[in-house]
């Protein structure tokens, strides 16, 4: 079956966002990444920066895993999750597209027309890339990578009860440090 929807989960600095944009451009479809954050912000009334950051934090922060009782009601993060879930489902119904991050692989797991991709790379490739592409100036880009990936993994586990980056959750996993950004895009396009 033809894959109308492509979801790209990625390690920070692996080039997943760039790969998603290339795939969408080559397939003539839309890529939802920053656009998805803008849509979530517009519909929720929250600031874009808050929405962006909320996608990497579990509700309640560090102690959330110890205190999962929601007797005080849903958190802002929970409300954003529900809205994000609905918007991603609507986008997938509306048109062929590439969706980067935001647990889209989980949200669309029941769709047979969805190709789920995970992009990763070794620490050196990613550290070099965030310094070169994003101008990262921290003393230890490796520490930043570990922190971002840890947050993404915790968010993913919290809302999906699945392990982020586990190959069993995706149709294909690509090492952008070995294969290269452009070739990763071509591989995905060939599978769509």
Cite the ranges covered by each PLM segment.
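RNA pseudouridine synthases
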Residues: 91, 104-110
């Amino acid at each position: 079956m033809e894959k109308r929807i492509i979801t790209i989960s990625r390690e920070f600095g692996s080039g997943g966002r760039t790969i998603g944009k290339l795939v969408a451009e080559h397939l003539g479809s839309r890529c939802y990444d920053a656009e998805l954050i803008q849509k979530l912000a517009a519909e929720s009334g929250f600031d874009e920066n808050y929405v962006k950051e909320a996608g990497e934090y579990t509700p309640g922060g560090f102690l959330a895993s110890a205190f999962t009782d929601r007797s005080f009601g849903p958190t802002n993060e929970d409300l954003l999750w529900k809205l994000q879930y609905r918007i991603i489902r609507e986008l997938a119904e509306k048109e062929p597209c590439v969706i980067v991050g935001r647990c889209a692989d989980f949200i669309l797991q029941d769709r047979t027309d969805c190709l789920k991709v995970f992009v990763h790379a070794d620490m050196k490739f990613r550290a070099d890339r965030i310094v070169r592409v994003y101008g990262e100036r921290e003393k230890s880009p490796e520490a930043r990578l570990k922190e971002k990936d840890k947050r993404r993994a915790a968010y993913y586990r919290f809302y999906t009860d699945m392990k982020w980056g586990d190959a069993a959750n995706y149709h294909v996993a690509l090492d952008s440090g070995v294969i290269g950004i452009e070739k990763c895009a071509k591989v995905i396009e060939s599978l769509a």
